[in-house]
Amino acid sequence: IITSISKDVSMLWPVNQSVAEVADTEENRKADISGRWGFDGEKITDLLTAEKARGMKGDEINAWRNAMEAANYTFEHNGRKWDYGKSTQTRLEPSVAAAKAGKLPEAFFWTDAENNDVPVTAEELIALSEAAEQAMFTKGMEIHIRQRTMKKELEKLTSADEILAYRVGWAQE
């Protein structure tokens, strides 16, 4: 049975200035470095409560949601695959503004998801932008619904171990 963990950080910071240094007390000897396990002198106890685990898993779900919302995806429009996502939207905005102002250069093109340069008119570019926004909205709703479902499922779990074992992601992953 492991009853203590220590880390030698003496080479990282000057003597007596390590952020890892703690007072050598009986109380400090009763918990491991993660704070999850305690030792009362006779037995090891799990200090992680279901509520703390739920908070940790909720943070993991939020991080998953943020990553999914920031990711790039593809969709079909007018027989081609196109990229969409926040970065695509950022790239499209100035070109769409130019299209709406009638200032697109001659022979303007947009590059599809398969890296083909596709000549587009102002109207086609605006339509592509609107289709990308709709695809983004649809994907955003899927992500939102999934993260809400995961959080509801999490609330039904009662033990820290069950909560920590819960898989974050799409249901089929």
Stretches with model-predicted labels:
Residues I2-E173:
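A preference for well-ordered globular domain cores
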